[in-house]
Amino acid sequence: SSSTQYEPHLNPYAATKHIIEKLPHTNACFMRLHTVYSKNPRKDMFIYKLLNGGIEYVSNNERDFIHVNDVVKAIELLLHSDLKGPIDVGTGISTKINNIIKGVPFKVTPKERKKTKANTTILHSLGFKCEENIEDFLLDNWSIMREMNPHSF
C-alpha cells in the first residue's frame, strides 16, 4: 500500500491504493511506506534530485522521510508478528520540503498530499525505533549537495 491512500481524491494512484485497502484481506499485513530515502534513491524522487542538483522547484509540502535501513527493520519485525491489515511505516516526523533547500522556485502542487506523517503506534508496540534521520543524512551528504547546489539549506 502507500501513505497516499489517506487522500484518495488527489490522484488515481492514491484512489487505487485506497480501494485496495478496502478489499477484504483476512490473512495479510500490508505496509504504507512513507518517503523512503537512501544514498542510491530512485531517480524520480526528491532525495535523488537534491543530491544530484536536479531540484526544479520546492513546495510547501511536508514529508515523513524514512531511511531504507529502517524500512528493512520494520519489515523484519512485521514478518515475525501476527499483525494483519495496513501498517504505516515511517518515522512519525514530518519535514517541510522548503526548509531543506532554498533558492529554487516555489510551486504549488495540488495533486500531492500536503503532509505525510506515519502513525507509528503499531510499529512502536513491536519495539520499532528508527535509527536514521533525514537531518543527519543530509548533513552527512552536505558536501555533495553543496557542490551541486550552492543554495541548499
Model segments located where?
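NAD(P)-dependent short-chain dehydrogenase/reductase
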Residues: K22-R63, V68, V72
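Conserved catalytic-site region of short-chain dehydrogenase/reductase
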Residues: S1-A15, V36-K43
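Non-catalytic, hydrophobic alpha-helical segments
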Residues: V71-I75, V89, I97-I100, L123, ...
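Glycine-rich Rossmann NAD(P)(H)-binding loop
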Residues: V36-N40, E56-F65, I87-T95, T109-R113, ...
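Residue-level signal for the nucleotide or nucleotide-sugar donor/cofactor binding architecture
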Residues: N11, P41, M45, R63-N69, ...
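Amphipathic terminal alpha-helices
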Residues: N133-F153
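Mid/C-terminal beta-alpha module of Rossmann-like enzyme folds, strongest
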Residues: L50, G54, H80-T120
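Active-site Tyr-X1-5-Lys
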Residues: H9-C29
